[in-house]
Swiss-Prot record:
Function text: Carrier of the growing fatty acid chain in fatty acid biosynthesis.
Any GO BP: lipid A biosynthetic process
Gene3D superfamilies xrefs: ACP-like
Domain Carrier: start-end pairs: 2-77
Protein name, as recorded: Acyl carrier protein
Organism this protein belongs to: Roseobacter denitrificans (strain ATCC 33942 / OCh 114) (Erythrobacter sp. (strain OCh 114))
UniProt-listed PANTHER family: ACYL CARRIER PROTEIN (PTHR20863), CARRIER DOMAIN-CONTAINING PROTEIN (PTHR20863:SF76)
Organism lineage string: Bacteria, Pseudomonadati, Pseudomonadota, Alphaproteobacteria, Rhodobacterales
Length: 77
């Protein structure tokens, strides 16, 4: 797993309180990991802070899964 994926996974585990093995590429933050809309906003803010990037609102809406987050951050870095 890439450094970005490891860091994203750590943020997801810490913010959502889920088991690390549940955070897989296809895991939906809402459907699979139990996040609500506020959790997803907090995740995006945590990703922005961790990686020093800005995620526009329209892009944030497309980040639905762990894999989406890793891809967006990889492309933005």
């Amino acid at each position: 797993m890439s450094d970005i994926a490891d860091r994203v996974k750590k943020i997801v585990v810490e913010h959502l309180g889920v088991e690390e093995d549940k955070v897989v590429e296809s895991a939906s933050f809402i459907d699979d990991l139990g996040a609500d809309s506020l959790d997803t906003v907090e995740l995006v803010m945590a990703f922005e802070e961790e990686f020093g990037i800005e995620i526009p609102d329209d892009a944030a809406e497309t980040i639905q899964t762990f894999g989406d987050a890793v891809k967006f951050i990889s492309d933005a870095s």
